[in-house]
Amino acid sequence: TITCDVCKIYNEQGREAVVNLIKEDVINSVHHIESLTGCKFNDPENPQLVSVRSGAPVSMPGMMDTVLNLGINDEVAATLAKKSGNERFAWDSYRRFVQMYGDVVLGMKPQNKTDIDPFEEIIESVKAQKGVKFDTELDVEDLKLLVKLFKEAVKKSTGKDFPVNAWDQLWGAIYAVFDSWNNERAILYRQMNQIPESYGTAVNVQAMVYGNMGNSSATGVCFSRDAGTGENLFNGEYLINAQGEDVVAGVRTPQQIMTEGSRRWAKLQGISEEERKAKYPSLEETMPECAAQLVEIQARLEEHYRDMQDMEFTIQDGKLWLLQTRN
């Protein structure tokens, strides 16, 4: 974690001052991650990918930027495919990274609702040519094509080739998270919620876990209580074979974590119990052990923080990982 104090220095003195201050610590911390995982950052033979996410001292949901799968390039994608035995997962992770990095770090994200997202435009075009509706229906060759077209879009927009060195990617993402403290959405959110501008944001660099490795993997968000009423009712949503913001992006219909919530949702949607179980089963039904772990974890976290918790999680090959929690 790079602390909020560094963000203040970044805002006051700029990038060079921050690099001089924290470069050695960042390198040592990445080596610490490597010692825990047994993988190597910026090594195509045994690659360690990371996520870079913000950590504001006061919760600002959806306002700050995150980059996943950082450290990937053509060689790393080939290694991931070989090691995992899942070529589609490797290239899906790669196309997601180029899209996120282009949006967050290289400034290609649409600034308002009328702007066209160049990456989404490319995805929709490829899906239309293939005659499919969902991203999950694209095969390996389609995903390789997306990576190629995304990189061409980056070159056209920025005039530069997409960065392939993991350290260059990492520093770009660190700067972008600090910059996101002063993006229009974040400034407006702080004004509306009386959050001091001086707080700044931390940057969290985490080892990646993957919710997009297949049907035994998933990603989701959950709340220890009903966010609308405060009722003591654990609830949340998840998607099989997904990653990052897929759950809230509206591309696929997310499923409920608890069976009770799933039945309630189906009733509101006019979906029969038979169809619900076949098409939209709860996590409790598809991965009961992970659901039980989540129930236990949310209770422990709420007791510790003495407040309702908003959590993000990933399931990789049937193993649950909690990514973050906030009050």
Question: Can you say where each PLM-predicted feature lies in the sequence?
Answer:
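Nucleotide/phosphate-binding sheet-loop regions of phosphoryl- and nucleotidyl-transfer enzymes
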Residues: 1-327
